[in-house]
């Protein structure tokens, strides 16, 4: 496992933990799952992909991005890296795309 993969795994685990233990927003706490994290080579930026059980993912995406500084603060307390990357949260739509493909395949039967 490369160093970058280890950093991504560490951030994944810690952000998921922050969502459960430190965030008061129940929509985020109960309905959001981190699916993937991609960190830039210089560790200055990280894109955090998430899914949600709710249909209002745009609202949740805005709420999470509004909490970026809080999440970064807690990361700095728990993760020992030279630099904590700037975070950008993006809804992971692969599940929705998969559902659409399944519906199309069902119509072909």
Predicted feature locations:
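Charge-rich, low-complexity N-terminal segments
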Residues: 1-45, 51-109
